């Protein structure tokens, strides 16, 4: 991915746009979007919660970023979950990825 942004506000707008893709498909869960960016706000990975019971936005974005997530920033429209349900906690994936900072 080569897209980049000028501010975290712009990155968050992108995450909100991604979240909208899940509206009507993830209930009763919230629609969530996530973007992984480097220090220059270049997009390394994106994701959204696309289906009830499926991977959450954070996991999708981290998988898209792969090893580039280490040391990067995760911008997400809702705080990462930390409970066990149909999917494992997103906080575990965030910690395992080496993300340096989370912006909500």
Predicted stretch roles:
Residues 5-27:
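Short, basic/aromatic recognition patches
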């Amino acid at each position: 991915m080569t897209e980049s942004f000028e501010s975290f506000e712009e990155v968050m707008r992108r995450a909100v746009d991604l979240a909208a893709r899940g509206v009507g498909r993830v209930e009763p869960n919230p629609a969530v979007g996530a973007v992984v960016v480097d220090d220059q706000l270049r997009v390394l990975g994106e994701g959204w919660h696309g289906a009830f019971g499926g991977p959450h936005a954070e996991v999708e974005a981290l998988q898209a970023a792969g090893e580039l997530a280490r040391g990067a920033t995760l911008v997400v429209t809702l705080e990462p979950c930390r409970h066990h349900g149909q999917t494992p906690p997103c906080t575990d994936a965030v910690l395992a990825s080496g993300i340096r900072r989370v912006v909500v």
